[in-house]
Amino acid sequence: MGYIKRIGLYISIFILIVMVAGCGKDNEIKEYSKETQIKNSFAKTLDMYPIKNLEDLYDKEGYRDGEFKKGDKGTWTLLTSFSKSNKPGVIDDEGMVLYLNRNTKKATGYYFVNKIYDDISKNQNEKKYRVELKNNKIVLLDNVEDEKLKQKIENFKFFSQYADFKDLKNYQDGSITTNENVPSYEAEYKLNNSDTNVKKLRDIYPITTKKAAILKLHIDGDIKGSSVGYKKIEYKFSKVKDQETTLRDYLNFGPSDEDS
């Protein structure tokens, strides 16, 4: 009888181990599946990179849903910004926003220069300079006396114009964060300095740290596609206080503004 009880105990333990292992495997599959979904969601736009001629977007349509009015061809919104802490307590943030309206085939936006202070009472100093896109060139619409800033604006390139994500599917073992209530999804990858996009960013921007960059793919909204919400890319080179260094990129398709 004791022998039979021991056999029964061993069988029970074995079944428990299999069940626990199975649950762990299920979680791994779900996590892997979510990572794949995030990549696939981003691939819909990142497959277009690099967009050498931004005016090509007039002939490209993104995800459409019920938020679009009848006859609205939609508007592409682009943003690229670079932020860096050059002295304690303040982060310099510069970049450009551009709206490409597929109805009017006009592209307007602005270049912004901002300082973000630890002391929030000082955060009232963003400057904007109006721009438009003509023949795939940025045209400055405001008078800018600072010649260095003027050249920076007129020669500005969005990350989407030179980035290449053909190896996106090869990024592995990302740290996945999800919040189904918002909903929001994020995949985070540690890159090395030999990464193609990292090397390009180091050539263009004053990135002083030699640390490997962290790539974040962030989605707010339906992971399968939605004109409500957004997708954002971040290359974070340093999170150290007073050494923060980040590149942000945003390319989304949505309903057109009636006033645009």
From Swiss-Prot:
Q: Name one GO cellular component term.
A: plasma membrane
**Which compartment or compartments is the protein found in?**
Cell membrane
Question: Does Glycoprotein appear among the keywords?
Answer: no
| Stored PROSITE patterns | PROKAR_LIPOPROTEIN (PS51257)
What membrane topology is given?
A: Lipid-anchor
Where does the record place a coiled coil? none
Signal peptide from the UniProt entry = 1-22
Q: Which Pfam families match?
A: DUF576
Lipid attachment, kind S-diacylglycerol cysteine: 23
- What are the entry keywords? Cell membrane, Lipoprotein, Membrane, Palmitate, Signal
Annotated InterPro entries: Csa, Csa_sf
Lipid-carrying residues in chain (N-palmitoyl cysteine): 23
* UniProt keyword Signal present: yes
Q: Which family does it belong to?
A: Belongs to the staphylococcal tandem lipoprotein family.
* Protein name as annotated: Uncharacterized lipoprotein SAB0389
Q: Which organism is it from?
A: Staphylococcus aureus (strain bovine RF122 / ET3-1)
